[in-house]
Every structure is written in structure tokens, then in C-alpha cells.
A protein has these predicted regions:
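FAD-binding beta-loop-beta segment adjacent to the flavin cofactor pocket
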Residues: 86-89, 143-164, 169, 173
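Predominantly flavin-linked oxidoreductase catalytic cores and closely associated redox partners
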Residues: 2-136, 149-153
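Internal hydrophobic alpha-helix adjacent to the cofactor/substrate pocket in enzyme cavities
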Residues: 128, 180-193
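Active-site segments that bind and position negatively charged phosphate/pyrophosphate groups
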Residues: 171-181
Length: 193
């Protein structure tokens, strides 16, 4: 390991920029540094009167284990629209890892979030009607929200504070994907340090 790197898990309250940058945390701790990489979504994003589009891609995924070989690990399902939630744009995708296990994820594009039991009901319906199993074990759960917006996140960078991730505008507004941008922008950051 590198003795110059220390992992700290804190919730960041604020970042001030002067001669040395001070990152203050909810716990009351303060850290100083030359560069800050900030993935927080700025407060200005939550304003509703600025004219920017705000749709949320939100999802609940289960890694499931079934008792019979119902999945083909050589095939995945990207946008299955057979299970619908009310009058929304939604889909389910399935990423099998074996004939018995897969990530099954229900995703919606809406301005407002739905209740957790509604995601769960859609996943249960998909498992029953599309996979053919009501007897399955949930091994892992993931939940996420990705802003789908034309808000200019990246306009908030400074000489020494770099916005990264969603808060840095790395997410493609039309798809919610960020893998390629994360790779490209991370390389640029490393080259400029």
C-alpha cells in the first residue's frame, strides 16, 4: 500500500477554496488539500425554475438465484418492456451470470420516484411472468437514481476543484450511461495532475 493515501469515510458538508482548500465534514472534521475531486450534485441543480430538463432514471435490481436453470449466461436482455408501471417509460434488463443466477433490474424514466414496494411488485411480476419463477432467493439488492438532465454540471469546475461523476456532468443525458466518459475524463485528470 501507499502510506501517503488514507481512506476516510465522511459526509462532506462544504468545500471552501482559498490558499489551501478546506473540505469540511458533517462530523466537524476538516481536511486541507491542493486538489478536490467532488462528485456531489450542486445545490443549484435542485432549483426548479431554471428551465433545465429534469427526469430521473431510477431502478431497483435484484441478484436472484432460482432452483432450475432458467437463465442463459451467454445471453442478456437489455430493454424488455413487457412489465409496465402505470403510464411510464420503463423496462427490465437481465444479466445472467449462470443458469441459476442473474441480475434482474427494473428501470423507470420519470420526474418523480415511486414507492419501493412498487419496484418490488414489478420485479416479482417480471420474475413470475417473464422468467417463470416465483420461488427465488434474492442474493443482493441495488437501488439507484441517475439524473437525466441538460443541467450544465461541468460549468462548476475551478483551477483546483474538479467535479467528477454525475456531479461533473459525466452522465450522458439521453441514456444515463457514464462508463466511457468516466474512463475518458479520468485519464484527462491523471494527465493534468
Amino acid at each position: 500500500g501507499n502510506n501517503r493515501i488514507h481512506w476516510v469515510r465522511e459526509t462532506v458538508n462544504s468545500i471552501s477554496e482559498d490558499v489551501e482548500h478546506v473540505v469540511s465534514c458533517v462530523s466537524g472534521a476538516a481536511y486541507t488539500c491542493k486538489y478536490v475531486f467532488d462528485s456531489r450534485i450542486p445545490d443549484a441543480f435542485h432549483s426548479t425554475s431554471d428551465g433545465f430538463i429534469r427526469i430521473q432514471q431510477h431502478f431497483l435490481g435484484w441478484v436472484v438465484k432460482v432452483k432450475e436453470p432458467l437463465f442463459n449466461p451467454d445471453l442478456f436482455t437489455v430493454m424488455d418492456i413487457r412489465v409496465v408501471y402505470k403510464d411510464t417509460t420503463c423496462f427490465t434488463y437481465v444479466l445472467p451470470t449462470s443458469p441459476y443466477e442473474a441480475l434482474v433490474e427494473f428501470t423507470l424514466f420519470t420526474p418523480e420516484l415511486i414507492e419501493m414496494q412498487d419496484y418490488e411488485a414489478c420485479l416479482k411480476k417480471y420474475m413470475s411472468e417473464c422468467i417463470g419463477s416465483t420461488d427465488f432467493e434474492i442474493l443482493e439488492t441495488e437501488y439507484g437514481i441517475i439524473p437525466m438532465t441538460d443541467f450544465p454540471f461541468s460549468n462548476r469546475n475551478t483551477e483546483s476543484i474538479t467535479r467528477i461523476g454525475t456531479g461533473g456532468g459525466w452522465v450522458k443525458p439521453a441514456t444515463g450511461y457514464s462508463f466511457m466518459n468516466a474512463s475518458k475524463f479520468s485519464q484527462q485528470i491523471l494527465q493534468n495532475l
